[in-house]
């Protein structure tokens, strides 16, 4: 049933979306929106009812070449602008994001199906990303002074050049700002290739860039498909690095496509992240975190804790409480303020997630909650929040990234067994530990194979901290100076003192 808030949000969203539906959504290259007449388009389908949100220009190799060349042409000017001026422009960009916060939230929720209660934070987090890296822009080039007798060594950090940014369809606005802000703060120019399944927030970002004060060509954006424009972005010789948030298989392709031009790559990829709950955990807080970290954002979050490793002495009580909580989750339209779980991004992904229900049964697991599409939401890509029990870690439901509101619960007895289960996967992005035993948490922090580990917390983000995975979950780190390590080159300068004697030969 539609609520008053739901109706108001739908009316506002329709008004914002009408502008984006009036003509095909186009590319932004060298400070100009590209002509749409006569161009091949693809349909942008929204996930709540599988209806059209309009047409999007399908980018070509020529479009991507133009964007890469524009970024290369703009790089000399942008890279030499002072850090203070970049700081000013990036803060202005953040101001402009905040001015359009409601539009961003409503468009994002409509385009990718994330619940509006979470997408209200999209602009807040996006602006925070820009402000954080804006403040770091003046110090981005700072290096080190390295002592050596008879010589003075110091390092310089310089922007690597034009870079490619490839972003996914889950929370696309925030993730785009997370990748783009440090690149611009470092002095790089960018070519943004957004996911074709959620193109609208990238369009809003490009619109904001028009007003922010960037020289033409600093910010470029090309819509389209990975096998065409994404591939060309990775191959183009003007592009010096590629930053991706996406699937592990896509990361492998990007490495191969960029190999001929020796592209630097930063890959933030998939995960099958464990949440390990010991019997001494704070029961209610652990329960809250388990529910939040798999069912919020529709389970379409790289750091989702999709494997619950629960100590057997607590298992029966915890699973009973978990099943009760799952039954209370509100599944509904993403623009309904009460909705906690919205639709999956597109029908193909819905079919993939639903296929794991049969896989679970065939493997001997039990579906303790969910496992179906709600009948009253049959026009959209909705999956009822699902829990698999009676599972073991060899099952596909415990090894593969399902990327939906689907949790697999597995029991363990000892700390050693918990570590073995946690590490028995190809992935290593994140892990969560719930225990009151400080010594145990410190031991597991050393032994669990993950790029990030939270103890007695959900995935709290601290912008200066490193973000990234190990194993098949990625290469490199984001956050603070870790981002600058990727977007910048380090140059060593060695100056001899008068006391230095040059070796003499042939005299």
List where the protein language model places each region.
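Short, well-ordered beta-strand elements within core beta-sheets of diverse protein domains
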Residues: 52-59, 74-80, 164-165, 275-278, ...
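Glycine-rich loop-to-alpha-helix module at the N-terminal edge of alpha/beta enzyme cores
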Residues: 51-140, 150
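Conserved C-terminal structural/oligomerization subdomain of aldehyde/semialdehyde dehydrogenase
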Residues: 51-55, 239, 276, 330, ...
């Amino acid at each position: 049933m539609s609520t008053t808030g739901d109706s108001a949000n739908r009316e506002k969203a329709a008004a914002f979306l009408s502008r984006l539906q009036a003509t095909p959504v186009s590319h932004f290259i060298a400070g100009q929106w590209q002509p749409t007449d006569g161009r091949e388009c693809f349909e942008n389908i929204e996930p709540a009812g599988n209806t059209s949100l309009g047409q999007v220009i399908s980018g070509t190799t020529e479009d991507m070449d133009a964007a890469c060349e524009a970024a290369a042409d703009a790089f000399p000017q942008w890279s030499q602008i002072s850090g203070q001026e970049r700081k000013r422009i990036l803060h202005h960009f953040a101001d402009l994001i905040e001015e359009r916060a409601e539009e961003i939230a409503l468009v994002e929720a409509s385009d990718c199906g994330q619940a509006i209660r979470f997408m209200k934070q999209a602009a807040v987090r996006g602006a925070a990303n820009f402000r954080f890296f804006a403040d770091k822009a003046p110090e981005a080039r700072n290096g080190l002074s390295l002592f050596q007798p008879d010589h003075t060594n110091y390092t310089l950090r310089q922007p690597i050049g034009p870079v490619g940014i490839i972003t996914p369809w889950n929370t696309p606005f925030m993730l785009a700002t997370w990748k783009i802000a440090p690149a611009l703060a470092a002095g790089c120019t960018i070519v943004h290739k957004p996911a074709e399944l959620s193109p609208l927030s990238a369009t809003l970002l490009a619109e904001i860039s028009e007003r922010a004060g960037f020289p033409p060509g600093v910010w470029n954006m090309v819509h389209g498909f990975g096998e065409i424009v994404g591939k060309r972005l990775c191959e183009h010789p003007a592009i010096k690095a590629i930053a991706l948030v996406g699937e592990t298989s896509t990361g492998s392709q990007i490495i191969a496509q960029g190999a001929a031009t020796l592209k630097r790559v930063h890959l933030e990829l998939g995960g099958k992240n464990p949440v390990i709950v010991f019997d001494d955990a704070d029961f209610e807080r652990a329960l809250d975190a388990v529910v939040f970290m798999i069912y919020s954002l529709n389970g379409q979050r790289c750091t989702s804790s999709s494997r619950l490793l629960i100590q057997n002495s607590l298992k029966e009580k915890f699973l009973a409480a978990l099943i009760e909580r799952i039954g209370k989750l509100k599944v509904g339209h993403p623009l309904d303020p009460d909705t906690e779980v919205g639709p999956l991004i597109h029908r193909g992904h819905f079919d993939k997630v639903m296929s794991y229900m049969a896989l679970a049964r065939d493997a001997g697991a039990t579906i303790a909650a969910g496992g179906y599409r709600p009948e009253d939401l049959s026009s959209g890509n909705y999956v009822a929040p699902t829990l698999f029990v009676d599972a073991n870690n060899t099952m596909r439901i415990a090894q593969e990234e399902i990327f939906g509101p689907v949790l697999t619960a597995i029991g363990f007895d000892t700390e050693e067994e918990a570590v073995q289960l946690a590490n028995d996967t190809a992935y290593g992005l994140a892990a969560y530990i719930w225990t009151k035993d400080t010594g145990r948490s410190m031991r597991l922090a050393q032994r669990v194979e993950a790029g990030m580990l939270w103890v007695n917390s959900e995935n709290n983000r601290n912008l200066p901290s490193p973000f990234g995975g190990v194993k098949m979950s990625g290469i490199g780190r984001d956050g603070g100076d870790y981002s600058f390590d990727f977007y910048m080159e380090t140059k060593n300068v060695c100056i001899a003192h008068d006391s230095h004697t040059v070796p003499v030969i042939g005299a």
